[in-house]
UniProtKB/Swiss-Prot annotation:
Pfam annotation, one family: MinC_N_1
Organism: Listeria monocytogenes serotype 4a (strain HCC23)
InterPro entries with a match to the protein in the record: CAP/MinC_C (IPR016098), MinC (IPR013033), MinC_C_sf (IPR036145), MinC_N_1 (IPR055219), Septum_form_inhib_MinC_C (IPR005526)
Keyword presence, Cell membrane: no
Subunit structure: Interacts with MinD and FtsZ.
BP terms from Gene Ontology: cell morphogenesis; division septum assembly; regulation of cell septum assembly
The protein, known as: Probable septum site-determining protein MinC
Keyword field: Cell cycle, Cell division, Septation
Protein purpose: Cell division inhibitor that blocks the formation of polar Z ring septums. Rapidly oscillates between the poles of the cell to destabilize FtsZ filaments that have formed before they mature into polar Z rings. Prevents FtsZ polymerization.
Amino acid sequence: MKKNVQIKGTKDGISIFLSDKASILELQQELTQLLADQKQNPYSGEKLEVQVQIGNRLFSEEEEREISTIIHKNSQMKISAFYSNVMSKDEAKKWKENDQIFSMATIIRSGQVVQVPGDFLLIGDVNPGGQIRSNGNVFVLGNIKGIIHAGFEGNENAVVAGKFLYPSQVRIAGKVYGFDSEDYKEVTETDLFSAFVNDAGEIVIDGIHKIRKIRPEISNFQGGR
């Protein structure tokens, strides 16, 4: 008979696998018995971080606490995280929002902050003092003189595309690039650029054509809002 609870060493460290076919009560009982058996649990005396893999199910906060309590009471192991193959409704909603392209046709004026959860397309200008914050990529069909913050929640793979003019500033995740030179006042109408984080962890400004090369997945974007 297949065990509902197993402790295994993986490439990511030690994991406790809990069958998604068993009830929470069965898991609690088998986990307690397994951890209490020194012969079956060679890790009982070690202070290790473990991952708890719960398969195709979700645990409530209370169920996670109950499993955590059993592990802490019967071993020296510390849970680093619970991992599931499925996502909650809130996680699915956030994922869907982050996967969308939001668009506006307007001018972002001084003091204005526009924030979106996914990619953002602006048809218009960003004036000095105006700011765009996006969890994804930002594309501006207009003049950029304000602040563009792509990958707002830490996504360094995000890119920015548009016509950067003095005194614009580009931020990608935690990186910052400021256009503090008067030279950018003379940029022509055809000067569209891309900004991205390179392998050295620095923001690079290059031609618009570079986007497809460094982020080929962007050409597959569909949808809008």
